[in-house]
Amino acid sequence: MSEISNRLEARLAREWQQRGPLAWALTPFACVFGAIAAARRAAFSFGWLKSVRVGVPVVVVGNVTVGGTGKTPTVIALVEALRVAGFNPGVVSRGYGARVTTPTQITPASAASVGGDEPLLISRRTGAPVWVCPDRVAAAQALCAAHREVDVIVSDDGLQHYRLQRDVELVVFDHRLGGNGFLLPAGPLREPLSRRRDATLINDPYARTLPAWPNTFALQLAPGDAWHLDNPALRRPLAQFSGDRVLAAAGIGAPERFFATLRAAGLTPATRALPDHYAFERNPFTDVDADTILITEKDAVKLGSWHDARIWVVPVEAALDHRLIALVVEKVRGRSPA
C-alpha cells in the first residue's frame, strides 16, 4: 500500500512542476481553494475572526508549498541563533500525527507517537521547551505559563494558522520553489507566491542565483558525521561508508534530497523512499541485503523497540545567513517588553 502511495505522490509532484493537462483540469478547484483561503485571511485581517497575541514575540517558520522544504533544521538553527543573541526561546508545533488534543510538553524522553517526530527531534537537538497542540495559541499560552523564562517563541510551521499573531514570518522553499505556480490541487501552493513575509529562505545547494524577492537568503544544509543508532557516541564520517553496501531510507517530505546529500558525499546507495512521517512500528529492512542502512534524524526518533545493528543516523545542520539572523533579532527586540 505504501508503494502505491509513494508512486501517486511522485506522480503528483511531477505534475505540480509543470502546467500540463491535469494541472489545467484542476484549476477550477484551485480557484475555489484560493477563494476560501483568501476569505479566511481577510476575516483575520479585518478582525471578523479573532487572532491572539501571546505575551512574547512569535517567529513563524513555515512554507507556502506542500511537502518538506527544510523547516525543521531551520527551526533548530534559529533556536540556537536566538540563544546566542541572548534570548530564551521556546517552540510550539501542531505535532503532525500527534495523539494529543490539549497542550502537551514534549521532552527528549517523549515518544514520537505522542507529539510527532519533528517536535521530538527539536526537543532533543535544542533542549528548548517544546509544546504541541492542534491549537497553536493554546500551545503558546501553556508554554509561556510553564516557562516564565521564555521570551520568544518559534513556531514550527503554522504559517496559515492565523489565529496565532506573529511578529516575524519566515518562508522556506527548496529547489522546486513554487512549482507550476498554481494553488492546490492544481499545483503545490497553499497560498500565492506573492504572499507577504518578512524573509524567504531557499534550500537549494545548486542554485547559482536566488529569486529577486525582498529579504531572500540561501539556506545551507550540510550532513554531519553519522552516529550509530545503538551507540550514539560512536560516529563515522560519511566517506567511511563508501566501501559498504549501503541502503539509504527516508520517511520525510522530500526523501530525494536526503539521497542526493549522500551521493554528494561520495556514496552510491540503494534507496528506499517511505511515506512522510512513516511510523517505523516494525523493522521495514528485514528484506534488505546491505551492510549499512543510513536514515535521517527525523526518522530515528520514531524507531520502535526493534533492533537492527546496521542502522546509522545522519544528522543535518542548517547554516543561517548572518543577515537573516540580524533581521529576526531586530524584529524580536522591537517587540520585546523593555
UniProtKB/Swiss-Prot annotation:
The lineage of its organism: Bacteria, Pseudomonadati, Pseudomonadota, Betaproteobacteria, Burkholderiales. Its EC number is 2.7.1.130. Coiled coil: none annotated. PANTHER family: TETRAACYLDISACCHARIDE 4'-KINASE, TETRAACYLDISACCHARIDE 4'-KINASE, MITOCHONDRIAL-RELATED. SUPFAM superfamilies: P-loop containing nucleoside triphosphate hydrolases. ATP binds at T65, V66, G67, G68, T69, G70, K71, T72. Pathway: Glycolipid biosynthesis; lipid IV(A) biosynthesis; lipid IV(A) from (3R)-3-hydroxytetradecanoyl-[acyl-carrier-protein] and UDP-N-acetyl-alpha-D-glucosamine: step 6/6. Signal peptide: none annotated. GO terms for cellular component: plasma membrane. Transfers the gamma-phosphate of ATP to the 4'-position of a tetraacyldisaccharide 1-phosphate intermediate (termed DS-1-P) to form tetraacyldisaccharide 1,4'-bis-phosphate (lipid IVA). Belongs to the LpxK family. The keyword Magnesium does not apply. GO terms for molecular function: ATP binding; tetraacyldisaccharide 4'-kinase activity. It comes from Paraburkholderia xenovorans (strain LB400). Keywords: ATP-binding, Kinase, Lipid A biosynthesis, Lipid biosynthesis, Lipid metabolism, Nucleotide-binding, Transferase. One of its GO terms (biological process) is lipid A biosynthetic process. This is Tetraacyldisaccharide 4'-kinase.
